[in-house]
Structure formats: C-alpha cells, structure tokens
C-alpha cells in the first residue's frame, strides 16, 4: 500500500495522477479502476522484478577481452546459481552478472579477491537505478511552453518573425545533420561489403528540409539488380567510422572523419546521386542549437538510453556469421522480401557497431527493418522497396527551396496540430499528410505560391518513372520562376485555417498534381483515381495517384480538424493575433501553439448522429437532454454575434468586438476578396443568430423570418461565444460563402438556399453525475419491472420513461422536486449542425474536471437514444 501511495499524487479539484503510468484520473472511482487495470499491475510487477534483479546482480570489470559470457558464468557458479550474464557488446569491458538468489550475491561480494584468465576482476554491487516505465506509444504532444520558446517568440516584433524563429528553434543543428551523415556513411560502408554496388539513401525528414530535433533516420537501401553475379560476401572489418561515432556530437571526431567511406561505390545514376543531400563535414562546426521544448523527441545520449535486455545483448554474438550464411544462400537468386529483410536485420545486429533493438516489420505498408543506434541516440528504419518515398522527399525539398514561406508555415502548422492532438499515429494525420495539405493550400492561392505537380512535370526536361508513376520534376529550383504572390506569412496562416474549415474533405479529392479539388460525387477520372481508397478525408499523393495519404483519418478526426481550424481562424481575426501585446500577454503564435486540454480536444470532437430530418433531430435531442438526463436547459434571447474567438476557446479579456449587421444583401461587385469564401480576411463580419425557445420548431422560425434567404448577409462561417450569458437555445442561420476561392458569387435564391446552414444550440446544466452507475441502475430497474409483471421498454415513449426513472434514482430526487439552488456540477453547450448531422459539446463550467467522463458517456448514449426515439 505504501508503494501505491508513493505512485499516486493528489491533484486539485479531486483528481489524481499516477506517476508510474503517467496518467491523470478525474476522481477516486476512476483511480481505483486504473489501479486494478492490467497496465498498472503490469508496471508494478515489472518494477518489482527489475528491483529484485538489481539486488541479486553484481558489476564485473577487468576481465580479458576474449572472455565470453559462458566463462564468466562458469566462474561465478562457484558461489551459487547464476541467472544470467549481460556483456557489454560494443566494448567488452564490463558485464553484469545476475545471481540466482541474494545469498549467492553476498557470497560473491564477501570474496576479497576475484581473478579470471590471469587478470584480477573488479566486482562491486550493481548500482540501483530508479525504475522508469516504458515510453508510451500514444502520440507525444510536448507543450511548447518552455522559457526559451516563450521568451523568443514573445520578443519577436511580429507574427512573421515568430514563425521564422520557430523554425530556428525546431530544426536540426549543423552538428546534428553531420552526425546523421556519419551514420549514413557507416551504413554504406557495412552494406557495401555484403552488396557491392548498393547505395544507402537517406529520405524523409532528414533531407526534405522539415527536420526536427530527434526525428527518425529513414534509409532506403538500393540493392540494384540482384540477378547480376555478385562476389562472395565476407564479414566486414570494423568500420573506420566506429571511432567517429564512439561519442555523440564529438567535434574532433566529426571534423576529422569523412562523410562517406573512401571505397564506397558511386551512385548508379545522376538522379540517385542527388539523394545524398549532404556535404563532407568541415573542420569547424557551427554551435549546436539548443533543443526546443517543441521537439517531439530529444536526441538521447548513451547514458539516457535504457539498458538492453540480456537477450538483446546476446543476440549479436552469432549474427555476423548468420548474416554471411544468409547472404551465401541468397547469392545468385532473387530473394523474397521477407528473407532479404531478415538478412538486413542480421547484418545490422552483427556488423554495425552500436546498433541494437533491431526488428523486422514485414507486415507494414512498406516493409522495413527498425533499429536504434546507441552512440548517436538515433532511431531509424531501413526499407528495400521505397524508391518512391525518395522522390517524395526531394519534391518537398524543392517546394521549400521555391519559396521561403513554405518552411515557416509547415513548421508552425505541424506544431499547432501536435498541440491540438490532430497529428500522430493511428487515425490521426501524419506529418507527411499535413505537409502535403499545406502545399496544396499554397497551390490554390491567387496568385499561386507554389506550382502544381503537372506544371513541374512539364518543366522537368528528363522523364523519371518509378513503379509505373511519373516522378518527373526539376531538381534545380533556380530554373523555375518565383511566385508573384507576396502575401505575408501571418495572412497565409490565417487563410489556411479559414480554407480548411470550409473545404469538403469527404466529397472532394485534394489533388496536388492538378492543384484543385476534384469532386467525388461526379466520378473521378480513371487516370487520376484508379485504386484510390476514399474516406472522410481525401488527399492524393503527388506521384502515387492510387494512394490517399489521409486514408487512415476517421470522420471524427476530420471533423475535429475542421472545428479546430474554424476556432483558429476566428482567433486570427482578433487583435491579439495581429498585434504585440503591450501588457505582456501571450500574443501572435503563442495562444495557437499552447497545447489543448483534454476537455477542449473533446469539445472539438463531433458526436455523429443517426440520419433523420434536422427538425426531428433537434426536437428529440432537446427531449433526451431534458427528460432522459435531467438537464436544465436555459432559454436565451435574440443576439447579433461576430466571428471573434480564441484558438479553441472563447477569448478572455474582451479582445473581440461584436458587430451589428444591417441585413442587407451584399453585392457581387464588392471585389474578389468578398467573393472568396475562404480568403481569411481580418474583417468584422458577423453572424445573426436567432433564439428558438424550447419547444419551438426551427422550421417555424425559418417560415416566420421577415427576410428572404437571399437577403441574408454573405458569411464565411459562424462562432458560438459560449461564455456569454443568454446565448443558449439558439439557432444560427448563416449564408456561407463559396467553398473555394475560385467560386463566384451567385445571386439566385436557389444557390443561396444551398449555402444556408442551420445550427441549434442549448445551454445545459447538470447537478448530479447521471452517467455514473447508470447501467447498474438501469438493470436494477428493469429487474423490478420484470418482477412486477411489466414489459420492457418497447416504444420510444417507454424507453424515455425508463431512462427518466433511472435519472431520478441516480439523482435521489422525486419527479416533482425542483432543481436545487446550489451551483450546478457542470454546465455545457450542446450544438448540432444541419451541415454534418453531428453534435459538439463544449464545457462552460467544470470545476471538478468531469467533462471528459460526460463526453465519453454521451458518445455512446446519445446516438442510441436518438435511434430508439426516431424509430
């Protein structure tokens, strides 16, 4: 119990943090459930096992270099049973011997002198290191709030300077780039011994100009034609670069070591030679840029890396011979992918100094061999059939060379997406997809910032085809005309948020080759979409036209992306974004880059609703919230609202002003800025919101509206200021602008009706945790009804009555009792939109941190409730 107490840290407002698992729980029941869960119990057992192993182990050094683990085991067995022996594989200067019990360890330590092979051994107790739980596999969202970052960005004169400064804080230093070049050269030297003529190409973030501290090292091993006769492979000598990589970022070693082995083979073609996008390190190194708090991973030193297990350390002993045997077996015949991956893995384990944790992943979309390099602290992977990714990396590098605004914009948006929980693995956007989204956006500006891939192909000169796909584009950016678009970075960032918030991600295909959105409904051209898998978000690879790089993104993540972009676009219209604060407040990029809390991330996550007419949905939703869950729904008044807001939350301090609208129709002749629905202008446009009293139909309000739909003001979006009183129970009726900048203003009423979007919102208050223990209470009530001879909830009315009774039991109140006068436990705004048939829930007051639990309950309960009442 004492160990459990030391792992748990109480938090304000009744929460708890488990320091062992690095998670936070909202209340005591959630904590109890976590402590009894499999993850926590596994880590507790693992910690106890590691501690017991440490208490039974001794540290041994001073033995001859030719002594192996078997000889050490035989020697120490004279004092008692030996559980394992872990050797220092790289240097062979020490070993950790784990005895079978504490008595054997004490016998070893009580011996005054040990000797083996004529050498005196130094034996001492193993140092006890504090247990650290394995790194979480969830996407890391490191808060960009370090003192260095805040100071650097706050002191910048404007937003553009902040974005440029952000690049300098996140990108790799010159020393880090040279270190990666040395690792690539080391790999080239080793693999050339087994596969003469092969070339190791770096790709991905290491060469695409969007690198960050700690990014992985992606390598493509180009083996050429394996059908050609190959000389017999031999075990390579110790690479000459091993000494240079003995200690990470050693200036002397880096300065005196060539970037590529002198006997390495030249690239097979001029195109391949451009992949080695680095020069030999000079004799003087630029000072290393300090790691930023924005980095998703940090460059680890050998000391900070976790020790390898005995199994991992011992695996390398026979891998060198195994690699030679596999290479002999595969010589003269075309190897299958799995066997070749195993061969590459064996070479890494047995022949590359400092490499550990080698793992082959043949089931990936592109089979790879993952590895870690201990001296440099780098994580990487090697692929054998990913030549297309090499050209993708060169294309991204070309885009960054064509316009200096590309890198600051990509770095800023990657950091913003990371803080919002939009980028990562699983159903989230990966960095490659997010970068392509930015490039597509820049292609669609007027005038364009970047050319389309088709335009680049026409100017390529030489045609390059990879796996049947046309990968032709100029390699030299100086051969292309610069863009005539001179918009500042701050404006482009605001326009990006505004555009993405109104793009039809599901109904269109964003094509970088054509530089436009292709409608999915009308059918896509076969030459542009054959084999393409469509989904909630469709973003086409620039070369592999059958690959949707956002195919993994779910509808929930796509909806959250647009909601976050809408909130960010609202913030970019405020003075807080445009001007430096004279009061020392966060301004410009800082509010955008602050990581979202779990509640704000959930509030941007839409809850999908079953198909039904919007009028039915709103009526049934209000009924479920009020009767089934016991929410008190407050009524509001008619209001005029501006689009001001904050990045994910309403602004504090009144930085946005409300603008009154005259309701008159805007003319199409006002200029191109007004015609572009996602131009991102910093205007004072507003949205007129009309209150619908509880029980009043949205359709009735539309029928009684004094103006025609075509007379409503032309708007680009809407925003609900949730912290204002009296805005609940409202329906926002806004005529949205065209979907893209190329759309023209249509004056007909039919077109205006298509652009009308209805949004109904309720301000709800809860005094009791009606979601906690609900299933148990429902089963108990159903059992009572069954014992009394009643029937189950068959119709929608019976189901609603049952749920209302469950709520009353959970509240401990009678059906006639009024709500108490005390402050509510939780208040929130529930808002449903006709455009996407979904519900968003935004917390207003949540002093106890209960909103995540409520949102999780509503995700399951509300869709099922609506299906029961609408059937």
UniProtKB/Swiss-Prot annotation:
Residue sites binding ATP per the record: 205, 392
Superkingdom of origin organism: Eukaryota
Chain sites annotated for binding Mg(2+): 216, 218
Subcellular location: Nucleus, Nucleolus; Nucleus speckle
Region (Disordered) residue spans: 252-321, 636-684
Gene Ontology cellular component terms for the protein in this record: mRNA cleavage and polyadenylation specificity factor complex; nuclear speck; nucleolus
Record CDD domains: NT_PAP_TUTase, RRM_TUT1
Domain comment quoted from the record: The zinc-finger domain is required for terminal uridylyltransferase activity. Together with the RRM domain, binds the 5'-area of U6 snRNA.
UniProt-recorded name of the protein: Speckle targeted PIP5K1A-regulated poly(A) polymerase
Phylogenetic placement of the source organism: Eukaryota, Metazoa, Chordata, Craniata, Vertebrata
